[in-house]
Amino acid sequence: MSNMQQKTDVILIGAGIMSATLGSLLKELAPEWEIKVFEKLASAGEESSNEWNNAGTGHSALCELNYTSEKSDGSIDISKAVKVNEQFQLSRQFWAYLVKSKLIRNPQDFIMPLPHMSLVQGEKNVEFLKNRFEALSKNPLFQGMEFSDAPETLKKWLPLIMEGRTSNEPMAATKIDSGTDVNFGALTRMLFDYLQTKNVELNYKHSVENIKRTKNGLWEVKVHDINSGKIEHHTAKFVFIGGGGGSLPLLQKTGIPESKHIGGFPVSGLFMVCKNQKVVEQHHAKVYGKAKVGAPPMSVPHLDTRYIDNKKALLFGPFAGFSPKFLKTGSNLDLIGSVKPNNVLTMLAAGVKEMGLTKYLIQQVMLSHEKRMEELREFIPNAKSEDWDIVVAGQRVQVIKDTDAGGKGTLQFGTEVVSAADGSIAALLGASPGASTAVHVMLEVLEKCFPSRMVEWEGKIKEMIPSYGISLTENPRLFQDLHTSTGRTLGLNEKETVHN
C-alpha cells in the first residue's frame, strides 16, 4: 500500500470515447500538459463505447423520428434535429482532421457510409413522415433526402422488409445516402493508440475508488491497481470523469454542490443479431421506425446494417432490460448505493412520475424469444427464429434531476456535462445521442472548465473543426464544402450523395 502522491496536470477517468476525445483535443491545444488515464478494465473502449454495446449510428437526425416532434397545429419542429446534426458535423470534421494529419489512419475501420432511412405504417404516420420530410428538406443539412410511399420504390429500397408483406396498410419511408455507421470501439482504441505516442500515461486495470479536494485546491484521486492490489494517490489540477454509467457515483464522491440532487436510473439494452449471412446481405441501411404510443424515446425500434471487425452484420432492437448495475461490469449495489440524503426525494419523485417507464421495463424483461421475434416480424415479415440470437448491449444510466420545466425528479434523456463552478472537475452523465456528439460535448467541457484559455485556443480549434462557433444551417456553402472535404478524407464520398 502506498500513500505517495503523484502529481500531474490532467486526470481522465475511464478509457471510453469521451476521455479519448477530450485527451486528443487537449494534446493538440496544450501539448505540454501531462495527462494520465485510469481505466478499470483491461483495455480501452470496452464498456459503453464497445461496438457491441451501442447502436453504432452516426446520430445526425437523418432517420431518428424522436428528434422531430409534431406540434399541435400539425407542423413539425425540426430544431432538435438540426442541433443534433450540427453537433455530428463537428465530430466528422475532427475525425477528418485527425486522419488528414495522420494522427489516426484507416478511417474505413471506424466509419462507413450507409443510407439512413425512416419507415412508418398507417395513414397518420405516413402523413407525419411526409410533413417531416418537407420540413427537413428546406434545411441544407438534410439535402439529398428522398420520400416515397410507392410500394414499388419501397421494394427497391427495402427488399428484406417488403418481402412477404401482406398488409394493405399504407407505408412510407425516407432515405438519405449520407448517413454513417460508426464503430466507436475501434475509434476509441485508435485515439488511445495516438495518445500513447504523445506520452499520455494509460493505466488499465486501475479502478478509481475516491476523489477528494486537497487543501491547496488540487484534486486527489485514490486508485486501486487491480493487478498488484496496491493503492495509489494521484493529484491533478483538472479531472474529467468519463466513466459512462460509473460517472455518477464518482461525481457524488467529489462533494461539489453541482453533484447534489442528481440521481440515475439504469436501463440495459438488448439487440437481436442475425446469424444467417444470406439474410444479412439482403439489407443495406439503418432503418428507424416510430416508437409505440406511450413508449420512452429509448425504445425506437431500428434494423441496422453494422460493420464490426470489417464484417457486415444485421442487428434489430433495442429491447430494454433491467439491472441495478450502472456498468455492464458493475455491481448489483450500484443503484441503491447512488441514493443519498440529497437526492432521495428526487429519486422518489421520479419513481412516482415514471410509472409508465417502470411498466414498460417490466413488460420488456418478461418478453420471450418468440415475443421478440413478433416485434422483429413487424420489420421483417419472413424472419425465422433460428436465424436470430439475442445479445446484451451496454448499460445506460438515465439522469434524474429537478428541473424548472419538469419539476422534481424529472427523467432526462440527453447527455449532460456537470462541472464545478471553478472548472477544476467535470463529469459526463446521460446517454443518447452520446458518442456521436463526443466532440461537441468535449468542446463544452473545455468552454466550461478552461474559459480563460478559449481565446488562445480558438485558432487551433477552428483549424481542427472549421465550423466551431458557426451555424452550418445559416452557411450552406460552408456546409457543402466541409461535407465534401470531410467525406473525401474519411472515404465516404464515393457512396454518399449530397445534392446541391
From Swiss-Prot:
Pathway listed: Carbohydrate metabolism; tricarboxylic acid cycle; oxaloacetate from (S)-malate (quinone route): step 1/1
EC identifiers of the protein: 1.1.5.4
UniProt keyword annotation of Iron-sulfur present: no
Cofactor(s) this protein requires: FAD
Pfam families with a match to the protein in the record: Mqo
GO biological process per UniProt: tricarboxylic acid cycle
Chemical reaction(s) catalysed: (S)-malate + a quinone = a quinol + oxaloacetate
Keywords from the UniProt entry: FAD, Flavoprotein, Oxidoreductase, Tricarboxylic acid cycle
Molecular function via GO: 2-hydroxyglutarate dehydrogenase activity; L-malate dehydrogenase (quinone) activity
UniProt cross-references to HAMAP family, sorted A to Z: MQO
Family per record: Belongs to the MQO family.
NCBIfam families assigned: mal_quin_oxido, PRK05257.1-1, PRK05257.1-3, PRK05257.1-4, PRK05257.2-1, PRK05257.2-4, PRK05257.3-1, PRK05257.3-2
PANTHER family: L-2-HYDROXYGLUTARATE DEHYDROGENASE, MITOCHONDRIAL
Protein name: Probable malate:quinone oxidoreductase
